[in-house]
Amino acid sequence: MYFLYVGIFGALGGMCRYAMNLWLGGGDFPSATLAVNLIGCFLLAFIMPFLAEKSRISLVLLNGIGTGFIGAFTTFSAFSVDTIELLQQGEVVLAISYILVSLIGGLVMVKFGRRFSNKLLRRGAHHVD
């Protein structure tokens, strides 16, 4: 059952990533890849703890969302290829900027996602009292 959910959600995540590429793609900077990776960092850090704590969603469905959808939506391989292509084009400053924004931005988005999730979880705990 895990494979089915991961596969279904993976297909949806891949389609969403493709749509983002159509929307933001083109140009000299890989903005679509950067966007999906930053959004994915936030979503994984926000949605997974929140759903695990506050919903009655099964572990199978949670794995489908996390591993399937978010895993297929984000892309480390495209990030790596984009970086190499920037370097091969002589865009060293742009490549280094892309690496730094991806890494630091991803960590910041995880921090924001966890904070937001924790804030909502605490707020929900106060309303139950």
UniProtKB/Swiss-Prot annotation:
BP-aspect Gene Ontology terms: cellular detoxification of fluoride
Residue intervals passing through the bilayer: 3-23, 32-52, 59-79, 90-110
NCBIfam families, per the entry: crcB (TIGR00494), PRK14231.1 (NF010827)
Membrane-related topology note: Multi-pass membrane protein
PANTHER family: FLUORIDE EXPORT PROTEIN 1-RELATED (PTHR28259:SF1)
Annotated protein name in UniProt: Fluoride-specific ion channel FluC 2
Annotated compartments: Cell membrane
Any Pfam family: CRCB
Keywords linked to the UniProt accession: Cell membrane, Ion channel, Ion transport, Membrane, Metal-binding, Sodium, Transmembrane, Transmembrane helix, Transport
InterPro entries the record matches: FluC
Family, similarity comment: Belongs to the fluoride channel Fluc/FEX (TC 1.A.43) family.
Main subcellular localisation: membrane
Name of the gene this protein is made from: fluC2
Catalytic activity: fluoride(in) = fluoride(out)
